Amino acid sequence: TWNRKTLMVSIMGLFILGNLLSAFAPTFLLLLVGRVLASLAHGIFMSISTVIAADVVRPEKRASAIALMFTGLTVATVIGVPLGTFIGQHSNWHMSFVFIVVIGLIGLIATSILVPKGMPIPGKINLSGLARIFTNKSILMSLFITAFGYGGTFAAYTYLTPILEGTFRFSASTVVIILVAYG
């Protein structure tokens, strides 16, 4: 039967599969498909893990549990992008994705061990309830701020390395240091 643990492990498997496809993609189209699979899995995983983090602690500790969980995302961004750049510069871009697969496997094992088994998936949500979310101005503003904030950060990461190396002539090792400082 499906419970939150089964769902989390399955989604982590999809994340790993997407990154494996990206690592060994023979064409740009398959690389994009792998990236889309991994990103969808990541978004779903973060959403569900937020709820699980809140549910496995006492009510007065929920905010701290969620904050701790998002600290992991922040650390992954601060360390992961420069580390991926470093791996790509000293090997090739494929190895950056292989490294993500290894981290994903560690996450899958940790999820299998640490997430409690008896956490059922909550009841079904009707579409009218979901539609109400998109009519709430405060929620919409929070969603837009989050999307544009993270989108802007990752867009900057996309162009930062080529600009630093091409325009400003920084060495690859200096770019890694700059990315760590930016993160």
Language-model region placement:
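Conserved MFS/SLC helix-loop-helix module at the cytosolic interface between two early adjacent transmembrane helices
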Residues: T1-P26
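A generic transmembrane-helix signature of 12-TM secondary carrier transporters
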Residues: M12, I16-N19, G34-R35, V101-L108
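Helix-loop-helix hairpin linking two adjacent transmembrane segments in secondary transporters
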Residues: P26-L30, P59-K61, L68-I113
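Juxtamembrane intracellular "pre-TM" segments in multi-pass secondary transporters
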Residues: V115-L143
